Design a protein with these regions (language model features):
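Non-catalytic accessory segments flanking enzymatic or RNA/DNA-binding domains
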Residues: 1-310
Length: 310
């Protein structure tokens, strides 16, 4: 297990069947096999147990912690409202791949939930956006001023609701636009695997065009990490272009290493490596790994399975 870094090759091969990862630190009692396309990686019983005491599932109404309400922007016309525990800071926004966000308020859990409902009802702001839609716009994001303006305008509309359904126990926080484009590596256009390391943004390949649909026994995913947003790793692959791997598809698989070729220089760290279901290393190693994708892929934006790639 190694640290992930932009510009570094990573790769693995899936082995055997995908098994349920269990729930809340407990092994799945059934040892159930789960579908390759499932992003949860759990059987129905373990999924139910995992959500049995969850803020997201509204089963923790008595949670005494302070919560924050946020406004998140993922692309043109793509905004949402959500809540997160104050002690977590912006971790939830990074997990969701929010390109830009601002805090709106802070207070008790139920006041935060009520604010979500008010924004949904009065402003039509959803509380969730499918990852597929987020991926579809990442290669075509506007500049920083337009991104910030979208969040500021939404904040102004939300703040205008004070006194009109806004819970009294929710303290409004000042507008502070946070842009995470650089953290995710999206400020640099993803380069193709064949592009020179010195290529400028204008010389680089366009945004990602394909995504991993599922892993399969013997399937290989390998490439050079160029961006990471939410659960998605953007990998430059041989022949040009970028493949997006939703890391939630990895859970429950045993993973084996793929051949390494050569060494690369030091690059900034972007996060911790991951492990397979049985703790096997994922071969996220700081070496140059040959680009190879041998799993079913789909066109980002709803296209069909790519022919000849599996």
């Amino acid at each position: 297990m190694s640290v992930l870094a932009y510009g570094v090759g990573l790769g693995f091969r899936a082995v055997g069947e995908r098994h349920c990862v269990g729930a809340r630190g407990n092994v799945c009692p059934l040892g159930a096999v789960v579908p390759g396309r499932s992003t949860g990686g759990r059987c129905a019983e373990c999924a139910r147990l995992d959500r049995a005491h969850s803020v997201a599932a509204d089963t923790m109404a008595d949670d005494p912690r302070t919560y924050r309400v946020y406004l998140a922007w993922f692309g043109p016309g793509m905004v949402k409202v959500g809540i997160t525990g104050e002690e977590r800071g912006a971790a939830r926004l990074r997990e969701q791949g929010a390109v830009v966000f601002s805090w709106l308020g802070r207070g008790p859990l139920m006041a935060a939930r009520r604010t979500e409902e008010v924004l949904r009802a009065d402003l039509g702001v959803p509380d969730r956006i499918p990852y597929a839609k987020k991926r579809a716009v990442r290669g075509q994001l506007p500049g920083p001023e337009e991104r910030a303006r979208a969040v500021a305008e939404l904040y102004a509309r939300a703040a205008a609701l004070e006194g009109r359904g806004w819970p009294e126990s929710l303290e409004r926080l000042p507008l502070e636009v946070v842009d995470q484009m650089g953290i995710f590596g999206l400020d640099r256009a993803p380069e193709s695997a064949s592009a020179p390391e010195s290529a400028s943004v204008s010389e680089s390949a366009s945004g990602p065009v394909r995504a991993v649909r599922e892993l399969v026994d013997g399937g290989v995913v390998a490439g050079r990490l160029v961006a990471a947003a939410g659960p998605d790793l953007h990998l430059a692959v041989a022949g040009g272009g970028v493949v997006v791997l939703d890391t939630r598809l990895i859970t429950g698989w045993d993973l084996a290493a793929v051949p390494q070729v050569g060494q690369v220089g030091q690059v900034p760290q972007v996060g911790q490596g991951a492990q397979g279901a049985q703790g096997s290393p994922m071969s996220l190693v700081p070496h140059a790994i040959g680009s190879d994708v041998r799993v079913p892929l789909i066109d980002i934006g709803g296209g069909g399975v790519q022919g000849g790639l599996f």
